[in-house]
């Protein structure tokens, strides 16, 4: 210190320096109280003294302060890291269960939704989760499902249902030869389908046979058959029951097409006696009836895998002549892809031909004689010798064990022929007289029929038809719905066919 009482620069005063160092630390609120005091810690005291002694430039005292880091408490940091909750929905959507007996009604639309805890409690008690329920079904099945009550009580939608079962046949072509679209409601988008059609003269049992092959049993009531049979009144006036083409699809996804009788005298009589106007391209009623029959036959030869030809006596040569004419007039169809893929371009004209099965209905006992059976096969083979229809090699009565004593090569030229007896009850009348005294026991045995039972023969015919091959009807694989649209185009093409028009002109 000078004589004037002022301190000189660069003069070290221990007491003063220590006092000034602790006075310049800043406000007391920012001190780090967790650290030990600098006065008591010898290491901190020596470091601060070195810093003070090294700063001798200038006229003021410069003190380097220890940096202090300011941080929020842990609880505040946790709250800041939590994201903000999304804004609540303006109007919550509540899925309510349908009201049942003994339970209060559901709240109104504007009522407050129950808390989440209540919903979780209900789900824990066994209620199904409110997830969307999807339905794979056809057009028109949704209304049937809602009408039958198969509705999910949680979401109000129809459950997953099996294909709709048909109880009776519907019209595919009406009596005026117009196409009907109602059958598509029963079809699915699957390709494993078999189409079976039938042709025959009037009163040969076409509808009965198709009902037994599709969904009915001989023991069922004939009034419940899927294809309506000829009633007693219609039979007495020699009329026909089926008009146009009837459609039915079984649970095995097999489509059955029942047709009106070909070359029917009842239809001709109806045209003549009722003064029904003929289309302008036909001049005579019998020409119109024959062309109707040819249109139906040509249509079946194009859209069916199997065509059954029924006759109740052996045999009508006009029937075979009619089949050959329909084969000639059938519309051309593309060959299946598995046949045309490896062939040359010259084979593009190969047409599709279905399997043809000849069914001798109402067969008698003598028709099952091996010699008679062999003659039937020989006659049919010679009549169909030049036909392209697949009339042989796909069905055999010898393979059904109907004639156990005959060898498989007994019939040299075996065709697709099957004999069906008259449908009668298998219970013999003599069984009802079992309690009558004085009757020998051997008389209680059933009478000799010469063939298996009607139930057995129908079952064997059905199994052989179901096991037939299913070639492609067109160049692409068709689903059930694709087949329906394909058949509609074929029917329209048959009605507008130039070949059929030219043939009708030649008939006069």
Curated annotation (Swiss-Prot):
<protein>
    <recommendedName>
        <fullName>Nonsense-mediated mRNA decay factor SMG9</fullName>
    </recommendedName>
</protein>
<dbReference type="GO" id="GO:0000184">
    <property type="term" value="P:nuclear-transcribed mRNA catabolic process, nonsense-mediated decay"/>
</dbReference>
<dbReference type="InterPro" id="IPR039177">
    <property type="entry name" value="SMG9"/>
</dbReference>
<feature type="compositionally biased region" description="Polar residues">
    <location>
        <begin position="1"/>
        <end position="10"/>
    </location>
</feature>
<keyword id="KW-0866">Nonsense-mediated mRNA decay</keyword>
<dbReference type="InterPro" id="IPR027417">
    <property type="entry name" value="P-loop_NTPase"/>
</dbReference>
<feature type="region of interest" description="Disordered">
    <location>
        <begin position="1"/>
        <end position="60"/>
    </location>
</feature>
<comment type="subunit">
    <text>Component of the SMG1C complex composed of smg1, smg8 and smg9.</text>
</comment>
<comment type="similarity">
    <text>Belongs to the SMG9 family.</text>
</comment>
<feature type="compositionally biased region" description="Basic and acidic residues">
    <location>
        <begin position="36"/>
        <end position="54"/>
    </location>
</feature>
<comment type="function">
    <text>Involved in nonsense-mediated decay (NMD) of mRNAs containing premature stop codons. Is recruited by release factors to stalled ribosomes together with smg1 and smg8 (forming the SMG1C protein kinase complex) and, in the SMG1C complex, is required for the efficient association between smg1 and smg8.</text>
</comment>
């Amino acid at each position: 210190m000078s004589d004037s009482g002022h301190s000189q620069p660069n003069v070290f005063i221990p007491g003063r320096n220590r006092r000034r160092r602790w006075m310049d630390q800043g406000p007391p609120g920012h001190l780090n109280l967790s650290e030990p005091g600098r006065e008591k810690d010898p290491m901190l005291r020596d470091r601060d003294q070195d810093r003070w002694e090294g700063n001798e430039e200038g006229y003021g005292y410069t003190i380097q302060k220890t940096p202090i880091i300011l941080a929020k408490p842990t609880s505040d940091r946790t709250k800041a890291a939590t994201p903000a909750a999304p804004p609540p929905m303006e109007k919550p959507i509540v899925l309510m269960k349908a009201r049942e007996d003994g339970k209060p009604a559901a709240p109104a639309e504007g009522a407050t939704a129950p808390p989440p805890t209540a919903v979780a409690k209900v789900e824990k008690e066994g209620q199904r989760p409110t997830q969307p329920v999807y339905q794979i079904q056809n057009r028109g099945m949704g209304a049937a499902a809602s009408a039958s009550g198969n509705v999910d009580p949680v979401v109000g939608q129809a459950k997953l249902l099996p294909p709709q079962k048909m109880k009776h046949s519907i019209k595919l072509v009406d009596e005026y030869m117009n196409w009907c679209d109602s059958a598509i409601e029963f079809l699915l988008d699957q390709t494993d389908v078999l189409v079976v059609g039938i042709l025959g003269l009037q009163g040969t049992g076409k509808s009965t046979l198709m009902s037994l092959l599709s969904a009915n049993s001989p023991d069922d009531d004939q009034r419940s058959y899927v294809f309506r049979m000829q009633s007693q009144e219609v039979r007495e006036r020699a009329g026909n029951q089926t008009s146009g083409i009837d459609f039915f699809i079984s649970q095995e996804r097999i489509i059955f097409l029942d047709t009106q009788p070909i070359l029917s005298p009842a239809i001709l009589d109806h045209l003549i006696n009722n003064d029904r106007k003929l289309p302008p391209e036909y001049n005579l009623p019998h020409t119109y009836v024959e062309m109707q029959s040819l249109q139906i036959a040509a249509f079946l030869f194009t859209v069916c895998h199997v065509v059954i030809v029924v006759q109740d006596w052996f045999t009508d040569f006009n029937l075979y002549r009619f089949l050959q004419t329909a084969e000639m007039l059938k519309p051309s169809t593309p060959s299946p892809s598995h046949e045309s893929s490896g062939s040359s371009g010259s084979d593009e004209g190969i047409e599709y031909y279905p399997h043809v099965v000849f069914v001798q209905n109402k067969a008698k006992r003598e028709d099952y004689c091996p010699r008679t059976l062999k003659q039937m096969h020989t006659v049919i083979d010679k009549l169909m010798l030049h036909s392209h229809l697949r009339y042989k090699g796909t069905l055999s009565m010898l393979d059904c064990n109907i004639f156990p004593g005959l060898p498989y090569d007994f019939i040299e030229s075996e065709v697709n022929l099957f004999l069906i007896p008259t449908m009668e009850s298998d219970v013999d009348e003599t069984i009802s007289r079992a309690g009558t005294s004085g009757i020998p026991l051997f008389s209680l045995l059933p009478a000799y029929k010469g063939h298996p039972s009607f139930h057995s023969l129908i079952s064997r015919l059905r199994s052989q038809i179901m096991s037939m091959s299913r070639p492609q009807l067109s160049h692409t694989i068709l689903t059930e719905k694709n087949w329906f649209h394909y058949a509609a185009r074929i029917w329209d093409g048959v009605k507008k066919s130039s070949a059929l028009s030219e043939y009708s002109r030649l008939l006069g």
